[in-house]
C-alpha cells in the first residue's frame, strides 16, 4: 500500500510540473511560452529572461516526467525542489507564508514532498525499482 501512495504522490506532482513546464516552454494549457515567460522573468530581475524561462521550463517538464515515472528520482526531486526554492526566493518569499497572500506555503509544500520522496525512495511502482 505504501508503494501505491508513493505512486499517487509522484504522478500528481510529476504531471503537474510537466504541465507547468509545457506552459513556460510551449504556451500550452494557458501558458505564455518562452517569450511571455521570459518577459515576466526579466520584469522580476531574472535575466536573461528567455534563458531563465528555458531552464525553469525544462526543469519542470523533465523533472516532472522523471518524478512521475520514478526514474532517477533523486535527480527529479532535486529539479522540482530547486525550481520551488527559486520560486520562493524570487517570487513568493516577500509575500509571507500564506498562499492566500501569494506567499510561499504551496511552494514549500511541494519542495518538501519532492525531497521526502528522494529520501524515502519512489516505491515499488517506479522505473528505479526495476533498475536499481
Name each region found by the language model.
Residues 1-36, 42-43, 47-58, 62, ...:
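Extended, low-polarity transmembrane helix blocks
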Amino acid at each position: 500500500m505504501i508503494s501505491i501512495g508513493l505512486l499517487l504522490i509522484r504522478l500528481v506532482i510529476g504531471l503537474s510540473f510537466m504541465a507547468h513546464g509545457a506552459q513556460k516552454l510551449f504556451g500550452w494549457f494557458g501558458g505564455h511560452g518562452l517569450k511571455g515567460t521570459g518577459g515576466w522573468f526579466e520584469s522580476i530581475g531574472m535575466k536573461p529572461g528567455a534563458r531563465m524561462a528555458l531552464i525553469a521550463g525544462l526543469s519542470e517538464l523533465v523533472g516532472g516526467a522523471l518524478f512521475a515515472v520514478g526514474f532517477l528520482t533523486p535527480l527529479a526531486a532535486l529539479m522540482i525542489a530547486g525550481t520551488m526554492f527559486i520560486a520562493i526566493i524570487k517570487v513568493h518569499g516577500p509575500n509571507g507564508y500564506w498562499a492566500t497572500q501569494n506567499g510561499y506555503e504551496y511552494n514549500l509544500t511541494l519542495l518538501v514532498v519532492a525531497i521526502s520522496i528522494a529520501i524515502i525512495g519512489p516505491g515499488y511502482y517506479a522505473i528505479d525499482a526495476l533498475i536499481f
